[in-house]
Amino acid sequence: MGIKGLFKLLREKIKEEEKEGLKRKELGIPDDDTKIKYKPLTVYRFRRLKGITVAIDASLAIYRMVYGKLKSGPSLVNREGKLTSHLRGIFYNVLTFLQNDIIPIYVFDGKAPDIKSKTIEKRKLRKDRFKLTSEDIKEVQILLDLMGIPYIIAPGEADVICSWLCARHDSNGKRYVKGVCTEDSDMLPLGAPYMFKDMLGLNNLNKNIIIVKLKDVLGFLGLTMNEFIDLCVLLGCDYCDNIKGIGPKNAYKLIVEYRTLDKVLEFLHKSNKITSTKTNKTISNNSDDSDNSDDSDNEIKDSNKIDISNDLEDSEENSDDSDSSDEASDSTENEICMLKAAEYFRTALKEIDESKTFVLTDDQLKLRQYQHDELMDFMCVKHNFDPRSIKNGIDRLNSYNKSMNITRPNKKVYHKIIEPKGVTIPSLSDDINFIDSDTDSDTDSDKENNESEKFESKNSRSKTNLIKRNSRS
């Protein structure tokens, strides 16, 4: 899910700044250099990122592959009826990364933190959601091993390890990865310096992606890292709900005014503008309680007071005592979650730094040689993919291995070959079905030639008659 409304807020602030810039230009006022130098959202052509290493949230990538296929057509399944769309998607996505000389490091979720338990329960209740099983994950890991692609199984959330890889340096003083390839903005309050949006599922080097630079986001919004974390929590994230009636613009105004989440919550309580996270009975009818809302009716009236409501409804007249009690309980519970979420964002990477069990190996960070026969068997025999397409993909993989000089061995057994004789790749001629009347006899050939001559002669006469008619006119 990520941070609710964060990118909406950034885009709207960018538009506002662009309008202000045009006004300053018309009035002959110099541009505000402090704003110009910050570019929180930058559009890049994918091929420009050549030669880097990226961390990828594996679970998110799998979901994107499955739902992407659902939008374009029926899902792919193997002979046993098991879904395989994600395997095909990961296979070709890896090839696109390698084609651009990019090393992908996939990171899989471990045990979810207790703070995320409510979010997980909500997701389980969604009937239309693709359920990612342990078998699905294992199959993707086998595919990556056979292709020689590194991956990490996180001790906790993949988000944290992805952000840690991006923020920390190896023994040579170089960051493990340049950025995190994800659509989940949780990476930013966790401390990932770079986030790459719209890169999952990419299969074209000429496509555009969006690079989100944390340093520029902070500078553009005029916030410290701690203030930005509090803003993200106030907006709502995977670990807590947002406060109903307070959308992106008002959340930003509150953080700018009060600077900390504690003081914002204190202000809201004193102003009687917060009692529940499930209803907005104490919030204005004009409040911005969704990511698509407009904050035009909720402005800062002066430097000492923020007005986020106009016509407050009387909660006592519109609810009974039990409802009020439930609302207060909901509010208190969510506020506790918000404070825990802020602390989690601040300390998650430090816990990895101090962990004595989290150790990285070369196999988790570097490319290895691929296993040709096993990969063909895994994809074509076990999962029923077209042999010719997979063979073409493996040929591409071989060329990228050579161009990237991948020499690290990969001899461990990840998949036991099902068809020892190898996968049969049908020739093009096998795909041609001749009908009974098709023969190679000379008489039939002569007949076809005669028919062809008659057709050409008829066309010639038609053209001649047309020329004569045109000349008469």
Swiss-Prot record:
Residues 278-332, 435-473 are annotated as: Disordered. Its EC number is 3.1.-.-. Residues 288-297, 310-332 have a biased composition (Acidic residues). Mg(2+) 2 binds at D184, D186, D238. Its cofactor is Mg(2+). SUPFAM superfamilies: 5' to 3' exonuclease, C-terminal subdomain, PIN domain-like. Binds 2 magnesium ions per subunit. They probably participate in the reaction catalyzed by the enzyme. May bind an additional third magnesium ion after substrate binding. Residues 278-287 have a biased composition (Low complexity). Residues 444-459 have a biased composition (Basic and acidic residues). InterPro entries: 5-3_exonuclease, 5-3_exonuclease_C_sf, HhH2, PIN-like_dom_sf, XPG-I_dom, XPG/Rad2, XPG_DNA_repair_N. One of its GO terms (molecular function) is 5'-flap endonuclease activity. Keywords: Endonuclease, Hydrolase, Magnesium, Metal-binding, Nuclease. Residues 464-473 have a biased composition (Polar residues). SMART domains: 53EXOc, HhH2, XPGI, XPGN. Mg(2+) 1 binds at D57, D109, E157, D159. Single-stranded DNA endonuclease. Belongs to the XPG/RAD2 endonuclease family. FEN1 subfamily. This is Putative endonuclease L386. The lineage of its organism: Viruses, Varidnaviria, Bamfordvirae, Nucleocytoviricota, Megaviricetes.
